[in-house]
């Protein structure tokens, strides 16, 4: 997806010869993935985000306080705001009403004009015109100057020219957009309420004082919520820490402007061992971090070390040099910056590159956090004690950590897990199977393609990293084996470029124990190597549940429906030859040839790629299911038990 770019409307090259390039929506319909990422569920939801981003831009400019989103019975969407309303006057050079330009021209909008919007949200920035292009129908009502103006469109083409359809009070302004996604474009036309709710909640936290309501009118799913966070990021941190035990009641909060950059920071420590830091730029979730996050982390480390130096703590602890990992253990933090012209980079264009932002955030941390700690010594001492405790654990883990650092490819020969490596060395071509059990590991080793497939058998269940400190995590032999085999390190030592395999495949039994082992592995990867998930390197193998055979015919089924369909297709037990059905309870029940054919052969296997669409929600779920607190886990199970379709008892 392309990042928002600024168009200079006064530039000499923006003339008639450029109109076709800038205005053609046909390119959007031909290659929608370039504009919204995909035509699956992700892209479908992105249409809503794009329209809501326009309303949020009005809020950022101080002109909107209420936004409503409605999912109608036919999965069409309405978004309403109380902003100024999209301009309806005729554009001086284009000869079209402003609203028609916004709806039919890529990159046409006030957000590209510094005088209209100082900052604007939305990652790709192509505007609501893309929503128009990818909708079978779109209608827009603009409340402005005491009148209600109306237009409608069909697949990006204007059907009804701008006209006045009603009157309102002079101070009643805003925009209403209704659209129905095009079934010729999207493979899935069903909106997920929870997906939209998570984003609306996030936007409410990031834009304090703006109320965002979400209503579902679909039969049997009727629901409505309003998200409003007057405390902004403070409330977001409280939400994130709801399933943890905070070490101090008050959320540390900074909200200021430095060199024309808006900086909002909120954080709170809990008694856990994981670091949960979320960063945003102009409401965009910067999954890959960037200069703002670097400024926050370095500033936090420096300030806490400075405070340690002037504190009244004992001399031995006072001499400790706290690392970034030490001061961020148990930290839940949210950082949001507002930048006029953000420069994005990285694999998914979600990494901030503006160098000036790092200095601004560091300066703010140095000045305001130092002042806060001096004014709140009780909170400061809690943070210091937590960091010192982490430092001691880090020192205890140092030797174990050193064992995990892969110096060369020769190191794998000493792996306690007996890695069967592949002969190719190009990480792009290589795959690593993490296999449950020695028995299945043996079958996988014999059945694999030795050129590009490596096998690492795992003995038993690894440690639950959600409940353990880093020294305990690294004392676990299986964990050390996995880290060394992958070769990229963990946490601050992690380097994606050093990863030895670009496909890391979790292959476990299709039973409760297998699911538990898979969950433990995913917890470890999410907490210690999240970059692997973000890069799309983590996959789940899908071994079959059944072997269905009749005579010389042999097929494999991955669920009960597929099994029953196969039995019916094979004629069932026709009296001459009976159908033989084998239920696989473990990978070890398959011989090497069967394991290759069903689960490992790139031409016939099915792999599920692990991705994190909502990092906040993923963090909450891992805390709930894998953390110490039993009550939230019980509530989660009670609420979701009805959705379980495959239960081993």
Stretches with model-predicted labels:
Residues 92, 345-357, 556-562, 566-570:
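Helical (often loop-to-helix) elements that flank the catalytic cores of nucleotide-handling enzymes
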Residues 2-15, 25, 49, 57-59, ...:
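GHKL-family ATPase ATP-binding module
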Residues 86-109:
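Short conserved segment of the HATPase_c
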Residues 17-30:
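Mature N-terminal segment immediately following signal peptide/propeptide cleavage
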Residues 392-411, 426-431, 442, 446-448, ...:
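C-terminal interaction appendages of subunits in large macromolecular complexes
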Residues 57-58, 85-86, 512-513:
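Residues immediately C-terminal
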Residues 30-49:
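Conserved short strand/loop->alpha-helix "switch" segment adjacent to the catalytic nucleotide/phosphoryl-transfer site
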């Amino acid at each position: 997806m392309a990042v928002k770019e600024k168009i200079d409307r006064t530039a000499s090259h923006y003339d008639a010869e450029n109109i076709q390039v800038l205005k053609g929506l046909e390119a959007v319909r031909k290659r929608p993935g370039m504009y919204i990422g995909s035509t699956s569920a992700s892209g479908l939801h992105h249409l809503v985000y794009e329209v809501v981003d326009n309303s949020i831009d009005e809020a950022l400019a101080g002109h909107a306080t209420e936004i409503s989103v409605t999912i109608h019975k036919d999965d069409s969407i309405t978004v309403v705001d109380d902003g100024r309303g999209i301009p309806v006057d005729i554009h001086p050079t284009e000869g079209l009403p402003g609203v028609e330009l916004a709806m039919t021209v890529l990159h046409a909008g006030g957000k590209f004009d510094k005088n209209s919007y100082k900052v604007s949200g939305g990652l790709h920035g192509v505007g609501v015109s893309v929503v128009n292009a990818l909708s079978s129908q779109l209608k827009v009502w603009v409340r402005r100057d005491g009148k209600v103006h109306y237009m409608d469109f069909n697949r990006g083409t204007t059907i009804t020219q701008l006209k006045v359809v009603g009157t309102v009070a002079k101070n009643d302004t805003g925009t209403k957009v209704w659209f129905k996604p095009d079934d010729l474009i999207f493979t899935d036309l069903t909106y997920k309420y929870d997906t939209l709710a998570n984003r609306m909640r996030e936007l409410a936290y990031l834009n304090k004082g703006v109320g965002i309501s979400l209503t579902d009118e679909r039969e049997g799913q009727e629901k409505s919520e309003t998200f409003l966070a007057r405390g902004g990021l403070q409330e977001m941190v409280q939400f994130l820490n709801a399933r943890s035990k905070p070490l101090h009641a008050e959320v540390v909060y900074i909200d200021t402007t430095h060199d024309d950059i808006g900086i909002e920071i909120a954080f709170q420590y809990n008694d856990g061992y994981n670091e949960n830091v979320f960063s945003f730029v102009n409401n965009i979730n910067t999954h890959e971090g960037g200069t703002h996050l670097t400024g926050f982390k370095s500033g936090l480390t420096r300030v806490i070390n400075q405070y340690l130096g002037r504190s009244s703590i004992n001399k031995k602890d006072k001499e400790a040099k706290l690392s970034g990992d030490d001061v961020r253990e148990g930290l839940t933090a949210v950082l949001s910056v507002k930048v006029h012209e953000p420069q994005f980079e990285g694999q998914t264009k979600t990494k901030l590159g503006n160098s000036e932002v790092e200095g601004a955030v560091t300066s703010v941390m140095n000045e305001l956090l130092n002042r806060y700690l001096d004014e709140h010594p009780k909170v400061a001492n809690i943070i210091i004690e937590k960091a010192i405790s982490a430092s001691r654990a880090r020192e205890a883990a140092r030797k174990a950590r050193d064992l995990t650092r892969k110096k060369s490819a020769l190191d794998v020969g000493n792996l306690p897990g007996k890695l069967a490596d592949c002969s190719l060395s190009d990480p792009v071509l290589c795959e690593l199977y993490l296999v449950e059990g020695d028995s299945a590991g043996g079958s996988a080793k014999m059945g694999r393609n030795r050129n590009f497939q490596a096998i690492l058998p795992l003995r038993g269940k690894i440690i639950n990293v959600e409940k353990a400190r880093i020294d305990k995590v690294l004392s676990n032999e299986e964990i050390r084996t996995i880290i060394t085999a992958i070769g990229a390190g963990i946490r601050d030592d992690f380097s994606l470029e050093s990863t030895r395999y670009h496909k890391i495949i979790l292959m476990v039994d299709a039973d409760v124990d297998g699911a538990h082992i898979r969950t433990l592995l995913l917890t470890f990867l999410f907490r210690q190597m999240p970059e692997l998930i973000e890069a799309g390197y983590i996959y789940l193998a899908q071994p079959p549940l059944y072997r269905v055979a009749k005579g010389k015919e042999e097929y494999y089924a991955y669920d009960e429906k597929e099994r029953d369909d196969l039995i019916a297709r094979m004629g069932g037990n026709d009296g001459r030859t009976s159908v033989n059905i084998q239920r696989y309870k473990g990978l070890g029940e398959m011989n090497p040839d069967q394991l290759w054919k069903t689960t490992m052969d790139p031409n016939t296997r099915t792999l599920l790629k692990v991705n994190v669409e909502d990092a906040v929600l993923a963090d909450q779920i891992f805390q709930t299911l894998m953390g110490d607190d039993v009550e939230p886990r019980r509530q989660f199970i009670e609420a979701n038990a009805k959705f379980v379709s495959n239960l081993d008892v």
